[in-house]
Amino acid sequence: MANHSSLPSQKYAASERQEYQKPQQNEEEIFYSVSRAAYLTVFKSSLDNITTKDQLQLVLQQTGRNPSNRVLNKYWTPRTKELNFDDFCAILKKEKPATKNELLKAFRKIDTNNKGYILHNDLYEILTTKGEKMSQEEVNSVFRLAEVNSNGKLDYNKFCSTFFKTCEQCAKVASERMDSNSKAKRQQFGSYIEKSPERSSSPKSSHGNLKLFDSETSTRKENKSSRPSSARSYKATMSTVINMGIPGTRTAKLIEPNNLKDWHTTSTKGCFFLEDNGDIISHHYKLQVSEKSTVYLTIKPLNLSKVEGKPSPWMSVDTSLFILKENNGRADLVSFTELRNQETSGWKGELGVGVYWLIPFTTGCRLRKKKKQTIKEARLVYRDGNEDLVLTPEFKSALSDMFDIIDLDGNGLLSLAEYNFFEMRTSGEKCDLDAWEVCKENFETKKNELTRQGFMELNLMEANDREGDPSDLWVTLQTMGYNKALEMTEACPFVIEVHAEKCSPRLKAVSLESSNKQLQGAVCKSVKLKGDAKPMDRYEDVIVYTYKNDTHVTSVMENKSDEKLILQVNNEQCKNCISSRGLQVFAVELLPKSVMVCQHVMPLNEKQEWMYNCVQNILS
């Protein structure tokens, strides 16, 4: 960001995020279902791998994409041996298909007189000599389409309509082919399963080795016993049943030290953000302890509601902290916040001199993609009697809350470091020192930091730069977790407090990123340390670790064998539960000599009893 005019406007494109109604498939489930249908037009199973660049091109084309050689080379390098279905889905999320408007815009650059058609001779010369050149036969195949060509001219409006209609028909045929066997549809692991009201989201690629299992496996008849699919033959099986009771009746609660007011204290804010692919990113922190001391630290959601008795909707999101110690370039698990008191999760223990990582964590059971519903778009700006642009009260309220979230130290001002976390989230770029000086010259500041009013002025300038077009403002809002009704549905702000008895702790936010690999490793270690271990019947090389506290159950699987295994996980007998996987039945691929998080499970209704009843079966 080199100048103030670009300060608020460098926002990356983000698809509209909206809430959902319960009976509908959610956005992520639809994405995986469509992706899988396209994959199965080329491969027999979604467990088959892409082994050549030509296969990658073909399967991408089945999704309506037409990847250039540059795009193909980005994902299929000289070192690439194969890509799996998860890799394929990741590519689809990065390489969006062209829209009809984009294609029409490209044609209109050629049709400078806006006639609605292009002469074959002109189009032939462009397509065979410019960019990635098409062959003569490829161009002629377009010209042979009778419904869009006449008298040596291509009607590009008709061509675009035909092209996208054909893409839709191909996707529909692929989906119908995948679902043609109604019995197999009941067994689709990793896709939407009907009649399961306790599920509200789809699987996330962030869970390590998750594979979407195919309906080509043998079918399962509906069975309400504690061991479903008893007619099926498994290599091994086991079940875990835990009656959890009512969450509010916990036996061990988080208790503050009596003399906490005499301890040294520091605090900071942060936020979980839900990505389009279901991943969750958050601020990461470094904690410096200068003297061996007893430390008490907590994390809880940040309530921004101004209405007494009506807390912010994200207050039900579970939050925890994992404490890691820097050790010769590694980060070793120290502990995590295990005890709770209402929304607050905390830990008390002794920390030695050194630098520690504090990594916020949420299970993903409650912060998750929502299903779509039609909602009225809020108005962001309007023109007053003098025709000047003005921010609406609703938008100003949302911006004020946003300011409170990114004001990490809570001093009512935004430092350059705090503002840059906001910029990295919304535009992917940082504000350099020169641009920050320009910012301070144009917007209200105090002590070299941006005030709340200055933040409002900055967003108003963005609206003026676009002559009232709110598109860029919506990108900012959506990347910060807001929907079109100005409700924050895909983010959860939180506050962290650190108290040390003998020294002044130093706490600093150092990054805003996904922590899948580091955090998944810490979760696995914590569950292995504190959970119950149980080997699978008839296959003791697979151990299932189950950890429970008052708020959730976490399951971790370890494969000690030298072979890759496919496991079915069945939650159909759970009561009042919601899984981080978003499904009642799914399959996972467990690599040789590996440990992975299977799932997190929480109560759907915290005021009622809940029961964790999970059956795991080795399929192969």
UniProtKB/Swiss-Prot annotation:
Query: Which ranges carry the EF-hand domain?
Result: 98-133, 134-169, 394-429
An annotated Gene Ontology molecular function:
calcium ion binding
Identify the domain of life: Eukaryota
Q: Which SMART domains match?
A: EFh (SM00054)
Q: Does the keyword Calcium apply?
A: yes
One of the record's GO cellular component terms: ciliary membrane
- Where along the chain is composition biased (Basic and acidic residues)? 213-225
Q: Does the keyword Ribonucleoprotein apply?
A: no
- Which terms does the UniProt entry file under GO BP? positive regulation of protein localization to ciliary membrane
Note the Gene3D superfamilies from the entry. EF-hand (1.10.238.10)
In this chain, Ca(2+) is annotated as bound at 407, 409, 411, 418
Q: Where is this region: Disordered?
A: 1-24, 176-234
Q: How does it sit in the membrane?
A: Peripheral membrane protein
The compartments listed are: Cell projection, Cilium membrane
A Pfam family annotated for this UniProt entry: EF-hand_7
Q: Keywords of this protein's UniProt record, alphabetized?
A: Calcium, Cell membrane, Cell projection, Membrane, Metal-binding, Repeat
Q: What is its main location?
A: membrane
Parts forming coiled coils: none
- Role of this protein: Plays a role in the ciliary Hedgehog (Hh) signaling.
What is the protein named? EF-hand calcium-binding domain-containing protein 7
Species assigned in the record: Xenopus laevis (African clawed frog)
